[in-house]
Structure formats: structure tokens, C-alpha cells
From Swiss-Prot:
Keyword Transferase: yes
Function, as annotated: Catalyzes the synthesis of Und-PP-GlcNAc-ManNAcA (Lipid II), the second lipid-linked intermediate involved in enterobacterial common antigen (ECA) synthesis.
GO biological process: enterobacterial common antigen biosynthetic process
Similarity field: Belongs to the glycosyltransferase 26 family.
Pathway given in the UniProt record: Bacterial outer membrane biogenesis; enterobacterial common antigen biosynthesis
Superkingdom as given in the UniProt entry: Bacteria
EC number: 2.4.1.180
Protein name (record): UDP-N-acetyl-D-mannosaminuronic acid transferase
Species assigned in the record: Salmonella paratyphi A (strain AKU_12601)
A Pfam family that the UniProt record links to this protein: Glyco_tran_WecG
Length: 246
């Protein structure tokens, strides 16, 4: 019998990554025995592995997160190459966030949203309430000063949120989640980057066929040619992958 509440770990470049078989497995893992796990979720793709390799602070932030999972198809392929018996599939961060919100709405789990432009955040809240009846106990857009951080953490703690999602981009969101956990430790935190923009239709995601073929990165590159410099960094990751240096 398969244990859906457990998941193997696979090490890439010294970082242990959770190997989920599919979205159902991910949700059963996070809500094992009906209890939502506490800690920090971090989506790992090739670009994030490269940044962690070059930036000790980012590596420490990622390393400290309890739940690191394979978000990028290149990372999934590397796991399968290094561990041929691995039954692991890509769980995209944007999809996991939506599934988590749907589950939270069903179970009445209190949610606090952080990040995004004010209008995008407001639309995100409205859509979450309408679509899944999510119990949003507070929110804060991404426009606040360093001096306002502690007040935000106090608000999150007072809200009793069990899920806190932060859309600020990496590593800003990881830094904020780390610091907020010192004030409000008993929650599941998730860094979600530009997910609110995609969810509300402000940014178009790659069509499903591109996603299924593992070409979402190419779609983004064609849509945003200025990303070419960032994509060139991935040649280094390809060297790791094909030389087995993972």
C-alpha cells in the first residue's frame, strides 16, 4: 500500500528535495492525518539551485526550509537521472498554491496573504473567496517599509493564520518568511513569487500543452525576450545535469 502521507527525499547539489508523485500526493503529505504541516515551502527550479550555489545567504535560507520541492521540469529530470527508480513529477508552485487554497477553503483553514500590488492583492482575495470560500484573515500588499515589518508580523500572529503565502520574489519572500516565523511559528508558509498576478489574469501563463511538454520556460522566454540573460545562466545547470555533477 502506498503511504500518501510520506514522501522520499532526493539530494541535488546537497539540497534534499521532496519527491511528490503528483498533486494529490503533495496535498496528502501537507495535510497528513488531517493536520496541516508547519514550516516553509520553497519551490526549487534550476535557477534557484544556481542562485543557492553562488549566494551563501540564499543557500542558508533554502536549506532551512522544511519543504523543498521540485517545481521546475529540469529539476525533476535531474532527479530521475540521478535516481532512476524515483517516482517523482513536477508540482508547479502556482498549481500547488491553488490546490492549497482550494483545500483551505474546504476545511476553513485561516489564510493570510502578503505581497503583490494593492489592486492585484484585492482581486486575489475576492477571487479566492468567490471561488473556494477561502477564510482570509488578513492581507498586506508588497508595498511596506522595513520599519513596518514587525507590525506586519504582529498582525499575522494576531490573525491566527495557519497558512501564510508571500508573493515578493526570491530571496525577499524567503527572508520575510524566515523572520515572520520567529513571531508566528505555528503556520505553513509558502513563497509564491508572481502567482497572484497569474491567478488574477494580469500575467498569462504558458498554455497547458507547453506546460505538459516541459517547455514553460521557453514560452516565458518567447513572451519576455529580456529573460535571455537569465536563461543563459542555465547552461551551467545543463553541464551539471549531463556530467552527473548533481
Amino acid at each position: 500500500m502506498t503511504n500518501n502521507a510520506a514522501a522520499p527525499l532526493y539530494s541535488l547539489r546537497g539540497l534534499p528535495l521532496i519527491g511528490w508523485r503528483d498533486m494529490s500526493h503533495a496535498l496528502n503529505y501537507l495535510f497528513a492525518d488531517g493536520q496541516l504541516k508547519q514550516g516553509t515551502l520553497v519551490a526549487i527550479n534550476a535557477e534557484k539551485l544556481l542562485t543557492a550555489e553562488d549566494n551563501p545567504e540564499v543557500r542558508a535560507l533554502i536549506g532551512a526550509a522544511e519543504f523543498k520541492y521540485a517545481d521546475g521540469i529540469s529539476v525533476v529530470r535531474s532527479i530521475r537521472k540521478k535516481f532512476p527508480q524515483a517516482q517523482v513529477s513536477r508540482v508547479a508552485g502556482a498549481d500547488l498554491w491553488e490546490a492549497l487554497m482550494a483545500r483551505a477553503g474546504k476545511e476553513g483553514t485561516p489564510v493570510f496573504l502578503v505581497g503583490g500590488k494593492p489592486e492585484v492583492l484585492a482581486q486575489t482575495e475576492a477571487k479566492l473567496r468567490t471561488q473556494w470560500n477561502v477564510n482570509i484573515v488578513g492581507s498586506q500588499d508588497g508595498y511596506f517599509t522595513p520599519e513596518q515589518r514587525q507590525a506586519l508580523f504582529a498582525r499575522i500572529h494576531a490573525s491566527g493564520a495557519k497558512i501564510v503565502t508571500v508573493a515578493m520574489g526570491s530571496p525577499k519572500q524567503e527572508l520575510l518568511m524566515r523572520d515572520c516565523r520567529e513571531v508566528h511559528p505555528h503556520a505553513l508558509y509558502m513563497g509564491v513569487g508572481g502567482t497572484y498576478d497569474v491567478f488574477t489574469g494580469h500575467v498569462k501563463r504558458a498554455p497547458k500543452i507547453w506546460q505538459n511538454l516541459g517547455l514553460e520556460w521557453l514560452y516565458r522566454l518567447l513572451s519576455q525576450p529580456k529573460r535571455i540573460t537569465r536563461q543563459m545562466r542555465l547552461l551551467r545547470y545543463l553541464r551539471w545535469h549531463y556530467t552527473g555533477d548533481l
